[in-house]
Regions:
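Minor-groove-contacting beta-hairpin "wing" of winged helix-turn-helix DNA-binding domains
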Residues: 366-370
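N-terminal [4Fe-4S]-dependent radical SAM core
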Residues: 1-9, 56-58, 376
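Alpha/beta-hydrolase
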Residues: 11-13, 127
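C-terminal scaffold of the Radical SAM
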Residues: 4-6, 24-52, 60-341
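Short amphipathic alpha-helical interaction segments
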Residues: 340-355
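A short, conserved structural fragment
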Residues: 355-365
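Local cysteine-cluster metal-coordination motifs and their immediate loop/turn environment
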Residues: 14-27
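Short, amphipathic alpha-helical interaction segments positioned at domain boundaries
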Residues: 372-385
Length: 385
């Protein structure tokens, strides 16, 4: 499932109605005036980046991804302005995949039609669960009924490519509730389902509860049982497992996210956004005041720039590539089997041990994690970093 190496664009919208208990993303509250000011600054950054990149050939951008936060807090007119600005300043493929992240209850039929008219052709909805008790525990403001209504409305508005996010291993959940969630979501027939385990992140409400002893993590063995049972059920429902946490009907894999897993270039725009362009990792500033100040002066809002070394590129290609169920091909990383394992000769025996344990498959043309290997994927990937 190797994608092309055309670049993509990520647009960060750092606003949400309310911070969820588990969320560690760069996001916060806003009003209409702040969102409008941000859209203007974002359009200015687009023009700044285009000028800075004009001396380099980057090819045709064939994905745009609005992430957050909750991008659907922007009006369809604001989303249209951003897309139009991108098209005026960059070469955007006429068949580009344009994704907008959204939350149930934050969508109206009018806004859905407006997003579709603006050029958005893929909708990603943060469902997380179809159990109202679990949704309340997560700090979500929607209900299962909201999800059903919004998916139906999205279909009526013309969306034929919808992703629904599901979360498992939430305190208060069980193997049974996890499978019930999958059954309920699959009845809505989305083209794509993301299936993530809850991670306790520092700074979140859940982490503070954990530190106070008020929250107990789901034990690892139950977390893994939920993952494997969920994966099995998703496959039975006709979804292909193509990345550790992602499942899609054939032909509906996330073209944008594949760029991250296959080391394709991408431009990040907006507060705290990261880019991988011209062999450099660039991170934008995380202060909204600083972002407004720099873009207002016609300056790129970059906080950090790191030029990748050869080892950075090799290590990142292996680390991200092993997230794909099909794994990596040596020719995409270092060339042949011999060249790859000569470069990684110091960890060859450890890799072989994982193979003997049934956690890693090493072939003449590449390697991949097994289902058991996915359970300890970070340990295996760390060998190559």
């Amino acid at each position: 499932m190797t994608t092309n190496k055309n670049p993509g664009i990520y647009v960060h919208i750092p606003f949400c109605v309310r911070k969820c208990n588990y969320c560690a993303f760069l996001s916060g509250a806003s009003d209409e005036a702040l969102r409008e000011r941000y859209v203007k600054a974002l359009c200015e950054e687009i023009r700044i980046r285009a000028r800075l990149m004009s001396d380099h050939a980057h090819g045709v951008f064939d994905t745009i991804f609005f992430g957050g936060g909750t991008p659907s807090l922007l009006t369809s007119a604001q989303v249209a302005r951003i897309i139009d600005e991108l098209k005026m300043n960059f070469d955007i493929d006429s068949e580009a995949e344009i994704t907008l992240e959204s939350n149930p209850k934050a969508l109206s039929m009018e806004s859905l039609k407006g997003y579709r008219d603006a050029g958005v052709n893929r909708l990603s909805m943060g469902v997380q669960s179809m159990d109202d008790d679990i949704l309340r525990r997560l700090g979500r403001i929607h209900t299962a009924h909201d999800v059903i209504r919004d998916v139906q409305n999205a279909r009526e508005a013309g969306f034929d490519n919808i992703n629904l996010d599901l979360m498992f291993a939430v305190p208060g959940s069980s193997l049974e509730t996890t499978l019930i969630d999958i059954e309920a979501v699959s009845r809505l027939e989305p083209e794509h389902i993301s299936f993530y385990s809850l991670q306790l992140e520092e700074g979140t409400a859940f982490f503070k509860e954990f530190e106070r002893g008020e929250l107990k993590e789901v034990p690892d063995e139950i977390d893994r049982a939920m993952y494997h049972a969920g994966t099995k059920l998703l496959k039975e429902k006709g979804y292909e497992h193509y990345e550790i946490s992602n499942f899609a009907k054939r032909g509906y894999e996330s073209r944008h996210n594949l760029k991250y897993w296959e080391m394709a270039p991408y431009l990040g725009l907006g507060l705290g956004a990261s880019s991988f362009i011209d062999n450099s990792r660039v991170m934008n500033v995380c202060s909204l005041d600083e972002y407004f100040n720099l873009t207002g002066k016609g300056l790129a809002p970059s906080a950090e720039v790191h030029e990748n070394s050869e080892h950075d590129n090799v290590a990142e290609a292996v680390f991200t590539g092993l997230r794909k169920v099909e794994g990596i091909r040596y020719e995409d990383v270092l060339g042949s089997y011999e060249e790859f394992w000569e470069y990684y000769s110091d960890v060859f025996e450890e890799a072989r041990e994982y193979e003997r344990e049934g956690k890693l498959v090493i072939c003449e043309d590449g390697m991949r994690l097994t289902d058991e290997g996915i359970d300890i994927s970070n340990s295996i990937m760390a060998l190559f970093v």
